[in-house]
């Protein structure tokens, strides 16, 4: 419950500070996270640190088809929200069954061409994609854009290794020579949670 758009920036800033002081230097945000407020908060928090001290990633929100055709408008807004002049890593967000045709329709939307232009200008240092779609969807995306993709972010954990065919997608990406970045290793915490009965038993042993 609660308001997803509300971010406790004081607590978040403390977490960032702890992470940075312990060697973390990669931070990931996106257009839609926290109802559009994540990039604003991340930008404000990271403004306290030298730009060269961290790597920042964001994503083009193609999961919402109403954003197709708005790559320039969205990208410029993202840079402004994050308070930076470039993204170290930028992704086609959530390549899946719902949006693959739009992502591949360069003639109509030109998303890929625009992002490659920003990469050539140094405003995107590394271009990649994240995927929740099927093996066939990832294959179609790679057949069109794979030669220019520098990394892929996949949902990999012991459930999705076979349930979402992560194993086959990893092998496909290996064939393309594209590094794999792991997301959701605990499936949003679900794989770290016990059933209420089992949790109660453990808590009873050590209140």
Annotate each predicted stretch with a short phrase:
Residues 1-54, 114, 120:
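N-terminal binding-site loop/beta-alpha segment at the start of enzyme catalytic domains
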Residues 1-10, 59-69, 101-103, 199-206:
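Active-site mouth loops of central-metabolism enzymes
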Residues 6-19, 67-82, 133-142:
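Short, acidic/polar
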Residues 19, 27, 42, 56, ...:
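Conserved, mostly hydrophobic/aromatic
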Residues 20-21, 43-53, 76-85, 141-147, ...:
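Acidic (Asp/Glu)-rich catalytic clusters
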Residues 24, 84-87, 124, 149:
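A structural motif
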Residues 80-102:
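Active-site groove signature of glycoside hydrolases
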Residues 94-207:
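Beta/alpha (TIM)-barrel catalytic core signal, keyed to glycine-rich beta->alpha loops juxtaposed to Asp/Glu
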């Amino acid at each position: 419950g609660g308001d997803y758009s509300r971010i406790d920036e004081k607590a978040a800033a403390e977490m960032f500070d702890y992470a940075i002081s312990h060697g973390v230097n990669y931070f990931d945000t996106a257009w839609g996270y926290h109802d559009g407020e994540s990039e604003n908060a991340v930008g404000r928090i990271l403004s306290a640190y030298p730009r060269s001290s961290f790597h920042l990633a964001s994503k083009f929100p193609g999961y919402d088809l109403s954003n197709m055709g708005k790559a320039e408008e969205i990208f410029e807004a993202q840079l402004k929200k994050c308070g930076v002049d470039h993204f170290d890593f930028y992704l086609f967000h959530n390549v899946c069954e719902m949006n693959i045709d739009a992502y591949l329709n360069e003639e109509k939307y030109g998303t890929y061409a625009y992002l490659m232009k920003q990469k050539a200008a140094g405003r995107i240092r590394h271009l990649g994609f994240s995927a929740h779609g099927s093996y066939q969807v990832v294959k179609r995306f790679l057949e069109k854009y794979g030669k220019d993709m520098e990394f892929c972010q996949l949902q990999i954990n012991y459930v999705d290794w076979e349930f979402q065919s992560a194993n086959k997608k990893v092998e496909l990406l290996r064939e393309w020579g594209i590094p794999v970045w792991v997301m959701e290793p605990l499936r949003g915490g679900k794989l770290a949670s016990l059933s209420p009965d089992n949790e109660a038993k453990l808590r009873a042993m050590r209140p």
